[in-house]
Amino acid sequence: MSSNFLHMPMTITMSSQNFQHHDHSSYFASITKDIEAHLKQSIIVKPPFTVYEPMYNLAFTTPPTSAPLLCVAACELVGGHRRQAVAAASSLHLMHVASFTHEHLPLTDRSNPNPMIHHAYNPNIELLIPDAIVPFGCELLTRLDNPIEDDHADRVLKVIVEITRAFGSQGIIDGQFHEKVVNRSNGEEENNNADWIDYTCRKKEGKLYACAATCGAILGGANEEEEEKLSKFGLYVGMIQGYSKIGRGKEEERLKRVEELTKLAIKELEHFKGRRVEEISSIILGP
């Protein structure tokens, strides 16, 4: 299994007596293996090689997110089977790849470029290939065929809507805009603005993880209340991820906010007492 494909979530011990956490790395490792296998089976390097070769490489070299793992865990939490969510998890990863690649284009007009990102391809390739990855990610969902479930097509359609909304102008793109453009125009003062940081984390990582949890719930056959609970759980987990990536600002305030979000996330899982909440709750403070 590729070591840089998907990070394993860290496990933590919660103060709440309702949740006792153990090492569930093997659980997430098995999910990672299934997602990776699905991607390798789906993305075949074939003509035109100028499209599929960089698409394949970007899919397996882009710094990963644990959101796809959350998608599968949410599906299993509500009683679904992993096979129902692996394609959606793979699609989420590809959408993340496209978004990440576009966000880190080596543009010369950026005031604060990121020197840590390795660029294997020219900017024109990194600009165009993600535009091919996005529809391909949606195509993975449409290939699913599950005659056992009468409403399977409806579930897939709902998932496609969730994913496109999360990565669109009301979600991650909006967060990227505020992080890059607004930050550049307002200077360092905005970097330490609590409202700005919270908004960015909510729109970027928050929307991604909320989408992942919601998609897993939908495919697993959750009811509306379960979908809402897991969507909120994903939102809080994603925002925690966002705050963990911020290496500047007031450390004490950030830690306080993360603690608040952790409590909110745990509260949403109380609805699922008696189910396999340990696995999904261990993703709260992932990498």
UniProtKB/Swiss-Prot annotation:
Keyword set includes RNA-binding: no
GO MF: metal ion binding; prenyltransferase activity
Tissue: Mainly expressed in trichomes, and, to a lower extent, in roots, leaves, flowers and stems.
GO CC field: chloroplast thylakoid membrane
Known cofactor(s): Mg(2+)
UniProt membrane topology term: Peripheral membrane protein
Keyword field: Chloroplast, Magnesium, Membrane, Metal-binding, Plastid, Thylakoid, Transferase
Stretches assigned to coiled coil: none
The family this protein is said to belong to: Belongs to the FPP/GGPP synthase family.
Quaternary data: Part of a heterodimeric geranyl(geranyl)diphosphate synthase.
Function: Heterodimeric geranyl(geranyl)-diphosphate (GPP) synthase small subunit. The small subunit alone is inactive in vitro while the large subunit GGPPS1 catalyzes mainly the production of geranygeranyl-diphosphate in vitro. Upon association of the two subunits, the product profile changes and the production of gerany-diphosphate is strongly increased.
Designated name of the protein: Heterodimeric geranylgeranyl pyrophosphate synthase small subunit 2, chloroplastic
Species assigned in the record: Cannabis sativa (Hemp)
Gene: GPPS.ssu2
